Amino acid sequence: VCVAEEPGTDAPDSALEQMARGLSQGLPPGGERPALVDALPEEGLVPNSQRFFHTHQSLNYHYYLARENILNLGTENDAVLARYQAGPSTLMLVDYREESKASEALTSFRDQITGGIEASEPRSGAFVASRQVGPYLIVVLESASGEASETLLNSAATRLQTLQR
């Protein structure tokens, strides 16, 4: 459970933590770790950096990508974001459940972020790469090198192939 305060409020961290614990305890028992989280490559994963979410608003809270919902995220999608030491890099995996929806999201992402290509070095100097594997979208953000982004992209693609329906 993620609980955040609005800018300008002075809620103590202990109160926010207490609220998050209360919400967590109110969730139904038996919840399982989402399979998409298990698809994250283990090598270089920063401990406790995984963030599971569904919507564009949640993505932008954890990692601001764009004002518009360029990935077509919604409650019907599962997504996970994690940081990696190599690079360092940020990796995002999204399950669209249908290849056509993943393809639309990939095209939108590339059109908006990488000029329509798989990998690029945007003006910020950090590398970005993306790929589709069946109904899944893989995005590597803020990688220090093209080689690091490609390695992480390939590792994630290999792990996602084990989840193929």
What is each residue range found by the language model?
Residues 1-165:
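Soluble, non-membrane globular domain cores that form compact, hydrophobic packing
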